[in-house]
């Protein structure tokens, strides 16, 4: 069982690469405790012996998205040295995700706790998050979790999932029907999903020998995707040449940025490019500016989404990350302070809040943003900064 109320789960927050002033550390530490308690106590549901479904919230949408679940699992893995239950919960989720979940045609938009498909729509990024969660577990635990029934190991499962990705043979880009906001894609290739594809290929390459995969082929995939991002997504922007939100790979593109597209903001954290990369910098400066149609103006304004009006905490998290990496510590501090001001006493964050007043507008229980912020506070995803390349 998770620790009871009032019992701290985490030690003092470790030094990090993101801007975190000393005066905000105690409040952020409290949010970490609350988010960790919510995942362990409310969203990581035991559905069978040795199996857990991680749902997006415990009241309104008792459904599982592989995307939301990944960021919650990332918090557990980031806290695994401090929380004795964390590794076991993630292992049980991986067993549910790869075993019980109905994956006919891939993971769909959302699944019920019994593994059945709830919303039948294919999102390319949600085929990649289960692979990353498995790789993250291997890194944190030093060993692979027990494979699902009927499988001697993980190699065949991973290889089959990787081969099934709808990657265009000419472009090297992966396509999806919907974007991470659960809205129909205007163009087939989404920037944040290609960043995620590069990251997954890079991570798989490092463990190719253990999984029986071809390291050279994975390196080639990563190189192709990185080159395609620079070649196929470039477009003019108010801060210089930037990357488009989505493209058809053959000349058409859309300039926009959404609070749901964390991988774009995380690109330097994962090592795709250094923070001083001009195209990434211009992309994120546009994302965090009123020139972006996804921006929500107001006293409490910030990055939002066409999916639901208002300022999104997921957008505030992107602002904290991007402005920290860009060296704008004053703006990074304001973004973090806004997140902590909006957070409930239990550490949870809503899906969206009013840009004029800060009042919550949607989803009072939403594990994804609080889990992501807490994982970042514990040092998740920062190792790639040391190996980032501008190539």
Question: Where are the predicted features?
Answer:
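Well-ordered alpha-helical scaffold segments within catalytic/enzyme domains
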Residues: 15-24, 70-84, 129-147, 195-211, ...
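Extended ligand-binding clefts on enzyme/binding-domain cores
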Residues: 66, 156, 169, 173, ...
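Aromatic-rich carbohydrate-recognition surfaces in CAZymes
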Residues: 62-169, 194, 364-381
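Long, well-ordered core segments of solenoidal/helical folds
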Residues: 31-48, 85-107, 139, 152-173, ...
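Low-complexity, Ser/Thr/Pro/Gly-enriched N-terminal "stalk/linker" regions
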Residues: 1-64, 92, 347
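C-terminal capping/lid segments that line or modulate ligand- or cofactor-binding pockets
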Residues: 119-137, 254-274, 311-391
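Acidic/His metal-coordination segments adjacent to aromatic residues that form catalytic metal sites
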Residues: 48-58, 106-122, 171-189, 249, ...
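Structured, solvent-exposed acidic/aromatic patches
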Residues: 152-155, 177-178, 184-198, 202-211
